Amino acid sequence: GQPQRVLNMFLHPTPNSVMFWDATVLLGYLILNAVIGWTTLEAERYDVEPPKWIKYLVYLSIFWAFSIHTVTGFLYAGLPGRHYWLTAVMAARFLASAFCSGPALLLLLLFMLKRLTGFNPGKAVVRPLSLIITYAMGINIFLYCLELFTAFYSGIPGHSDPIVFLFMGHEGVDAWVNGWMWTAVVFACASLFLLLIPRFRTNDRILPWALIMLFIATWIDKSLGL
């Protein structure tokens, strides 16, 4: 009921808290995107070149994006009471899923604009982005496979039991999340299969479906799956 109390995080900073750094990087990224977006759109509106200084903010925002998902991963990995979150690759998983789902959503919006307004982003934009998505999704699935190996090969119940519950339920009783998790697995594997084959990845009819499945899979993994 009093959102102004959020300012207390900055008026009384606590650098030993991960939440303080999370709020800092999120606010910084919001300001960067607001300035970059507003300046670029204003230049587009008046049909002029954007100022040269905006380029340096764009470069800064690229590196800043890494900090957002890294700190978010630290929020989870820093809680020793949750074995499923207590993993060194949690931040890397957040980065990989962000670099595949974020560009995937961007490409889907571009395809929607193309269909509704006739705006064509061109192959010079679509092809590199789809390749980045492919690599990031491959890394994302690989990191989750590392989690599975560590959990089940070690035989530590605290690591394996949460995964068993997510996919199989508990003591023979299905959980509501089981169907969602298997859907995420099917969609993730199917989307990566379509993206790995250049003939499918460069097909503008097939690519959107692969991106939709990828986005749903990563959303389930980073929401219901955590």
Q: What does each model-found stretch correspond to?
A:
Residues 11-190, 194-200, 217:
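Long, contiguous internal "core" modules enriched in hydrophobic/ aromatic residues
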Residues 203-206, 224:
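C-terminal nuclease/phosphodiesterase catalytic domains that cleave nucleic-acid phosphodiester bonds
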Residues 4-12:
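Aspartate-rich (DDxxD/NDxxD/DxxxD) Mg2+/diphosphate-binding motifs
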Residues 219-226:
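Membrane-proximal extracellular juxtamembrane segment immediately upstream
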Residues 206-216:
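Central hydrophobic cores of alpha-helical transmembrane segments
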